[in-house]
UniProtKB/Swiss-Prot annotation:
Upper classification of the organism: Eukaryota, Metazoa, Chordata, Craniata, Vertebrata
Name of the protein: Ribosomal protein S6 kinase alpha-1
Phosphoserine: modified positions: S54, S221, S307, S363, S369, S380, S732
Catalytic center residues: D187 (proton acceptor), D535 (proton acceptor)
UniProt keyword terms in alphabetical order: ATP-binding, Cell cycle, Cytoplasm, Host-virus interaction, Kinase, Magnesium, Metal-binding, Nucleotide-binding, Nucleus, Phosphoprotein, Repeat, Serine/threonine-protein kinase, Stress response, Transferase
Reactions accelerated catalytically: L-seryl-[protein] + ATP = O-phospho-L-seryl-[protein] + ADP + H(+); L-threonyl-[protein] + ATP = O-phospho-L-threonyl-[protein] + ADP + H(+)
Subcellular location, principal: nucleus
UniProt-annotated location(s): Nucleus; Cytoplasm
Biological source species: Homo sapiens
Length: 735
């Protein structure tokens, strides 16, 4: 089912009485009163032997790039390693001040280090280094560019139960692994579930985790986020790993409905609801989802699914997960439903701007008490994976220049970082200039967009999400001064595709096939992701260098591009699109995809014929050109057509079909014999008209098309209800 993010989730809900508990005291008697043990440390002491690497790390080995988050006793930075063996690699560095940590927090920090050093799992964040100075503790972790699941919920991507199932299944495997090590997570909430750049999850923030000595041992300390707490945590009667499965149910409920199952007006009321309230079960959820939620929301932990001797296997066997291939899931072979919009390696677009806009500064720590250093004695760790099998350090990665991407909307001055050079091109809403980065002297292009004429947010998001494709222009930097947005991209040194082709002394049909194959693959990738370019004229297809190699082509200028969205303006996962999108929305998407294919057909025709199909030159009127386009008639005889293969003519005809819904799809273009059997194509030279005449005719064609339709205005998505509901609860750190 599509998941309705409800304003008020309780109408039409079945109230489910949760099982009464034997021996559980009421909230007034237990969980809602301050515990006399609250100040007593009851954490279990953990010691681990960790195999050391070749050298211990220290703060000087890391270059601070950005602040990612900040809490009451520390910060999280984006850092770059500057020493071998992993120089140039990006990490998240968690810095905790010893002097501001209470004793129980100090033990939690050492616990987090010990747990992470012992855990190696595809869905748990990896610890690479841990060390201390006189006043601080340092944890060096994976830098996960996709942000957290909290962000996904608050931005309300339209997803289905199948999509939620993917995240919950990966989460179940991660929790199962922690439980197998005797670790109770205890702080399971969306903020602590991060996404990598592909969209897979990683559990993080183990400050509240507890390592149990055995399955009979229970923990008693009061910890975690109250809305996600299990009843036995609330009433402090002791809890085991089954408390995590209650929190897992809360997370599942929230992801499926957009609301928390137990939330009062304050902390005390919320705790009372957790201990006593009947659960409102939304009837739009599948029977399988409702069944799993009921099995997880058992107030008696002994009756809760996942608490038995089989542990997580009970969860995995539930009918809700009948479609999951757990082995494929563990191997990360199942494609995530959502790909975060991240591009460059030091990209922090998905972290809170309140933190990322701050100048990174690792402030000196206050001298700690004498006892603090003893507590953290031996607190250092180097991941063994940073060593080769023979004990020699790994070769360093290619050096990364020190351009640090700036957040869109950060109000930094573009000219502080770049010197602007000559104009490259001018459009209706923007102009493009060459620029030089002051710190590195590297050349880029900058597209300066007038915000009063066009909202660039869709273009930025598409470039961030898909710009890592080898044949899509790469976004390097974004600035916003209020009036203009500056998009810094790689510089296209090789010029336009048609310029290069028509200036060649020899250009053959076989070479044209290689060009179309490269561009077709890129368009097929975009269409498969629900993105249509809608302005694929040859002047927007350029070479990144002067080699003329088809693999060096880039599709540029996504100013008219669109991502497939629901009627409410939200993005949709592929599962949502396939099952719940209105026919007229899909028809419109098919029309837009057909327009992209038509543009590729125009390009193919021009490469083969040496002239454009519907315009004779720049002096043709828009009316004349549109009449020819509307008739769907173009010549495939005379000139080059006398030597061009029949398969080429067949492909051109099917790409330029007058009915957009009868044109080939990008996938069908790639499967056409003219593309798949390049070695059979002629290598004879193709002639062409004068370059300026061809380019003038091409410009006239697209000018006529653009004059015949109004330009749609893209509007930014308003803040969601869920985001507003949870904004006051934003965590101080996402790591």
């Amino acid at each position: 089912m599509p998941l309705a993010q409800l304003k008020e989730p309780w109408p039409l809900m079945e109230l489910v009485p949760l099982d009464p508990e034997n021996g559980q005291t009421s909230g007034e008697e237990a969980g809602l009163q301050p515990s006399k043990d609250e100040g007593v440390l009851k954490e279990i002491s953990i010691t681990h032997h960790v195999k050391a690497g070749s050298e211990k790390a220290d703060p000087s080995h890391f270059e601070l790039l950005k602040v990612l988050g900040q809490g009451s006793f520390g910060k999280v930075f984006l850092v770059r390693k500057v020493t071998r063996p992993d120089s140039g690699h990006l990490y998240a560095m968690k810095v905790l001040k010893k002097a501001t940590l209470k004793v129980r927090d100090r033990v939690r920090t050492k616990m987090e280090r010990d747990i992470l050093a012992d855990v190696n799992h595809p869905f748990v964040v990896k610890l690479h280094y841990a060390f201390q100075t006189e006043g601080k503790l340092y944890l060096i972790l994976d830098f996960l560019r996709g942000g957290d699941l909290f962000t996904r919920l608050s931005k309300e991507v339209m997803f289905t139960e199948e999509d939620v199932k993917f995240y919950l299944a990966e989460l179940a495997l991660g929790l199962d692994h922690l439980h197998s090590l005797g670790i109770i997570y205890r702080d399971l909430k969306p903020e602590n579930i991060l996404l990598d750049e592909e969209g897979h999850i990683k559990l993080t923030d183990f400050g509240l985790s507890k390592e149990a000595i055995d399955h009979e041992k229970k923990a008693y300390s009061f910890c975690g986020t109250v809305e996600y707490m299990a009843p036995e945590v609330v009433n402090r009667q002791g809890h085991s790993h089954s408390a995590d499965w209650w929190s897992y149910g809360v997370l599942m409920f929230e992801m499926l409905t957009g609301s928390l199952p137990f939330q009062g007006k304050d902390r005390k009321e919320t705790m009372t609801l957790i201990l006593k309230a009947k659960l409102g079960m939304p009837q739009f959820l599948s029977t399988e989802a409702q069944s799993l939620l009921r099995a997880l929301f058992k107030r008696n932990p002994a009756n809760r699914l996942g608490s038995g001797p089989d542990g997580a296997e009970e969860i995995k066997r539930h009918v809700f997960y009948s479609t999951i291939d757990w082995n494929k899931l563990y191997r990360r072979e199942i494609k995530p439903p959502f790909k975060p919009a991240v591009a460059q390696p030091d990209d922090t677009f998905y972290f809170d701007t309140e933190f990322t806009s701050r100048t990174p500064k690792d402030s000196p720590g206050i001298p700690p008490s004498a006892g603090a250093h003893q507590l953290f004695r031996g607190f250092s760790f180097v991941a063994t994976g940073l060593m080769e099998d023979d004990g020699k350090p790994r070769a360093p990665q290619a050096p990364l220049h020190s351009v640090v991407q700036q957040l869109h909307g950060k109000n930094l001055v573009f000219s502080d970082g770049y010197v602007v050079k000559e104009t490259i091109g001018v459009g209706s809403y923007s102009e493009c200039k060459r620029c030089v980065h002051k710190a590195t002297n590297m050349e880029y292009a900058v597209k300066v967009i007038d915000k009063s004429k066009r909202d660039p947010s869709e273009e930025i998001e598409i470039l961030l999400r898909y710009g890592q494709h080898p044949n899509i222009i790469t976004l390097k930097d974004v600035y916003d001064d209020g009036k203009h947005v500056y998009l810094v991209t790689e510089l296209m040194r090789g010029g336009e595709l048609l310029d290069k082709i028509l200036r060649q002394k020899f250009f053959s049909e076989r070479e044209a096939s290689f060009v179309l194959h490269t561009i077709g693959k890129t368009v097929e990738y975009l269409h498969s992701q629900g993105v249509v370019h809608r302005d694929l004229k040859p002047s927007n297809i350029l070479y990144v260098d002067e080699s003329g190699n088809p693999e060096c082509l880039r599709i540029c200028d996504f100013g008219f591009a669109k991502q497939l969205r629901a009627e409410n303006g939200l993005l949709m996962t592929p599962c949502y699109t396939a099952n719940f999108v209105a026919p007229e929305v899909l028809k419109r998407q098919g029309y837009d995809e057909g327009c992209d294919i038509w543009s590729l057909g125009i390009l193919l025709y021009t490469m083969l014929a040496g002239y454009t199909p519907f315009a004779n030159g720049p002096s043709d009127t828009p009316e004349e050109i549109l009449t020819r386009i509307g008739s769907g008639k173009f010549t495939l005889s005379g000139g080059n057509w006398n030597t061009v293969s029949e398969t080429a003519k067949d492909l051109v005809s099917k790409m330029l079909h007058v009915d957009p819904h009868q044109r080939l799809t990008a996938k069908q273009v790639l499967q056409h014999p003219w593309v798949t059997q390049k070695d059979k194509l002629p290598q004879s030279q193709l002639s062409h008209q004068d370059l300026q005449l061809v380019k003038g005719a091409m410009a006239a064609t697209y000018s006529a098309l653009n004059s015949s339709k109004p330009t749609p205005q893209l509007k930014p998505i308003e803040s969601s209800i869920l985001a507003q509901r949870r904004v006051r609860k934003l965590p101080s750190t996402t790591l």
